[in-house]
Amino acid sequence: LYFYGDNVLYQCYARVADRYKDNNRYILVMDLISNLRRYQRREYYRFSCALEMKSRPLEKEEAEEKVEDKLATDLPLKGSIIVDISGGGLRFVADYAYEEQSLILCKYRLLLNGRSKEYSLIGRVLSVRELENRRGVFEHRVQYINVDAGEREEIIKYIFDEERKTIKNKREHSDLLKNEE
């Protein structure tokens, strides 16, 4: 079964316990046989993080090309913080707001195999909202446009590597606490 909430989808398994007809409507009584859990419809897993990023809007000519190789390199970039990243895009916060549906250049570095690599990717701003608890700070959701398959795979590899590190650290921390008891 799937349940829709406020912009959220939940899923569980259920068994039909009873069925009957009432006022020309068929009614099913269901017994839940699993816990209700949030269902993620995304194509890519989102990894929570705090990474520095620099960005700028694309010029009209650049937006028409949508190719990273032909971007102007001398235009100023603004700083921001990526708060989650996936193989399909990212979410970042900044003290400025881009226009929704605009194309932007996103530049950030990821540590892969012990080496830092810079990514310069074009993204479409899907949504922008001012944070309720931090006036003047805006959250942006961005979807990558024309990202190279190799770069997408590297980003996904980075996410899985970081998740592995997090799980390992939690286990080690848990083991330390058990040993202290």
Kindly label every feature range from the protein language model.
Residues 1-181:
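Structured alpha-helical
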